[in-house]
Amino acid sequence: MRIVHAAHYSLTRDGTEFFNCEFKFHTGLCQAGHYVYPFSINDRARANIFGSKTFGKGFSNTCLLACCKNVEPDLLLLGHAQYIKPETLRLLRQVHPRMKIALWYVDPVYAPHDYGHLFPKLPYLDALFVTTGGEHLDQFRKTPCRVAFIPNPADSNLERLNLDEDHSKKAYDLVYIGSDKNRHERRSFLEELIQKSDGLRLGFAACMNQPPVWGEAKDHLLRKSLMALNLSDRNDIALYSSDRVVQLTGNGLCTFSAASSGLQALYEPDQEMVFFDSLDDLVVKAKRLSQRPDEACAIGRAGRIKTHQRYSGKAIGDFMCTFVMNGTRSSSPWPQ
């Protein structure tokens, strides 16, 4: 197919966000045999004398209309697309009646997060893909737009560290990368983890008064750890996780997630991922595996293989295209 992928490519960031989902979906769709034209929503919005996205919203919408006129895609795939107006989608429907329109969304779809901009777009979408499962999908099922769960995408050229191959020279037993700014519950959890760690070597970035890390600096931190902790804003939302989960599992780290997340539907417990019921349970399991690095690496290896086989950008791209064009979930290697 010929696809216009309109998302926040953030080309002005000079590669600091090279690991974002936009690029993984783009590459995966190309690997699946499609032609993909990139349209960077935010960068087009900033293309004004003030460099302001707010002032440039209208311009970005005008540019998207022109882009679809020039490319004549079979599919317009939107990523988040906060700045794309429903009126723009209505016009695109009118001018390109044979073109399918779909949108993927990888942020939370529960309060207090701001995702209200999705609802006015639904009447003009053929499909909506979100990285949340269960009952939270029901709120979008009030129009003919079809809705489906997708996992966060991985890319073997990005998540390529293969950290399960060598457990020597590790500075940390368990590392956590994620912000605790204005996240009091997360901060309290991490503080209690430190108090109860009792010999566990813990590493932090972007939290616990440690600076954030990006790009190679983040990879360097991961290389120094045997295991990693995957936390989301809420850990009781069916199948939801930030894309941190594939950055950890895809690189071969033995990854810990809350059992309440439901990620057991994607990863086999104690074989591909370790699940904990409480902070005390996390500490017990992390301590045990820190003393059994071969077992930790075996879990990391199995998780890495599952991530790249089942949840690659290509696999998810294949599913999205089949779903939006044919309305079928038959190619889905994950539960719906």
Where are these regions (language model features)?
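Nucleotide-sugar donor-binding catalytic core of glycosyltransferases
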Residues: 1-51, 71, 80-87, 119, ...
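Short acidic active-site motifs
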Residues: 63, 88, 113, 117, ...
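Short hydrophobic patches on amphipathic alpha-helices
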Residues: 68-69, 92-93, 122, 222, ...
